[in-house]
C-alpha cells in the first residue's frame, strides 16, 4: 500500500525527518506516535505532499506502485483527493466559514468523482449519514459555526472519504474535542476503516489512544522511526527506551472502574524535551534524555527485531515493560 524508503525532509539544510523505512499494509491502521516536535505531522504532510515550498523532500514515498515524490503538483493533488484522504487537527480552521456544509462536501465529490447534479447531493447526504451526523438533509444547509466541534470534524471526515480513498491520514483529529466526543470520533474512524477496507495513518501523541484505534504502531523521535510493528507486541514488550518511557508516562485506564487505584500515584516523566531542529545529537537522537545511554549510543544503532513484526533501533533495549 504505502512504503517510505530513506525519506528525508530538510529546511534550510537542517534535517527534520530521516526515516529509513515505514510500511502501511492494505486495510491496516497504523499509529504514528511521539511527543510534540518529534516529526509526526511533518511526516504525514510529506506523504500527502502538503509541506511548504521551502522544504526539500528526498527518498521515496511509494503508493500504489508509484513514487509520490516524482509526481507534479497537479498529479499529486488529483491522487490526494481520490486515493488519499487527509483529516486535519482543527476542523474549525479547515472549513470555510462562508460556505455551507453541503457545498464544502460536494466540492470534494465534484473534484474527485464523476457524479453530477442530484447524484452529488445524494452522495453528500449519504456521506453525512455514514459519519453519523443527524438529519443530514437539514445539516448540509448549515454553516460551520452552527455545528459543534465534533460535528465539524465529522464533516471533515466525510469530505476526506468522498472519493472512497485507499488511505486516510488523520493528523491528531481529536485534539480540539472533549473526551466523550473524542471517543466517538475514534470509533467512527475504526468503523470506516473496517467497512471500507481502508488503510489508516493515525497521528497522535497518546499511545493509549493509538492502542485503542490501531493494530500497528510506529514510534517517532527526532524525525526517526525508533520502533515499529504490531501494537500488542510493542505495548507489552517495548524495546526502545523512548517507547518504554512513553508507556511509563501514560496513566492508562483503571481496571473495573477502580479509580481509587490512581489516587496518589506518581507518573514517570521523561527528562528534558525533544531537541530543536539542527540540535539533534549524533547516533541515537534520544541518548541525551536516556538514563541508560552509554558511549555506544553516539553511533547509530542497527535495526534489530524482537519478532518478525517488531523492529527497533536501540543499543540497550528495554526487554519488556512492567
Language-model segments: what does each one mean?
Residues 56-67:
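Conserved ABC transporter NBD signature motif
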